[in-house]
């Protein structure tokens, strides 16, 4: 009887592990990497706010997974790492960590503002608007118009930088998408985002 119970428990755990329930170590490692980068140039208060954003994003995206099967949290932390690598300010990194919480989770801008301040909520809102613009203007003939509208829509250039960091990490994991979506995303990046990155001086990332 005990053997049967133990066997059943192991089967259940194996099933849960296949669903990524227990796969937290990689996100923890990425969090340490983000902190190592940020502590080189940011004050302790900013780093604490970044960790607060990591914890908030972890709860907001709980149960969400990437196409790769990895916890969704891996994506916003990688966006944060890219931004920290560019030595962006703390609010920009926090907004990068939270850039999907309003669009993909039941989180309001009001809540983001209450917890992280108006500056961060404005950046998150800007990224959300840019995403909506992206979806409307993906045709080849509208690339130049997209660049103009993106800069006009994003009152703060940091919005564009966050969106580019988001796109950059998505490209690094593009192999997990169906072939047609890989082609679509690559085309969008080359025609819409790469020229935009050059316009704002992000040559190394473009």
Where are these regions (language model features)?
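Single conserved hydrophobic/aromatic residue that forms the stacking wall/gate
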Residues: 1-12
């Amino acid at each position: 009887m005990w053997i049967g119970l133990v066997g059943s428990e192991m089967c259940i755990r194996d099933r849960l592990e296949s669903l990524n329930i227990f796969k937290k170590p990689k996100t923890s490692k990425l969090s340490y990497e983000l902190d190592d980068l940020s502590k080189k140039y940011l004050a302790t208060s900013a780093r604490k706010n970044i960790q607060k954003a990591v914890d908030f994003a972890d709860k907001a995206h709980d149960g969400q997974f990437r196409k790769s099967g990895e916890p969704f949290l891996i994506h916003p932390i990688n966006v944060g790492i890219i931004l920290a690598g560019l030595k962006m300010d703390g609010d920009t990194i926090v907004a990068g960590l939270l850039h999907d919480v309003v669009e993909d989770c039941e989180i309001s801008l009001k809540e983001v503002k209450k917890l992280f301040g108006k500056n961060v909520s404005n950046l998150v809102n800007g990224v959300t608007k840019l995403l909506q613009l992206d979806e409307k203007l993906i045709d080849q003939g509208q690339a130049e118009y997209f660049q103009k509208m993106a800069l006009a829509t994003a009152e703060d250039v940091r919005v564009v930088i966050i969106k580019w960091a988001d796109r950059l990490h998505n490209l690094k994991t593009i192999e997990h998408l169906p072939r047609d979506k890989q082609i679509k995303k690559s085309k969008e990046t080359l025609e819409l985002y790469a020229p935009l990155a050059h316009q704002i001086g992000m040559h190394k990332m473009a």
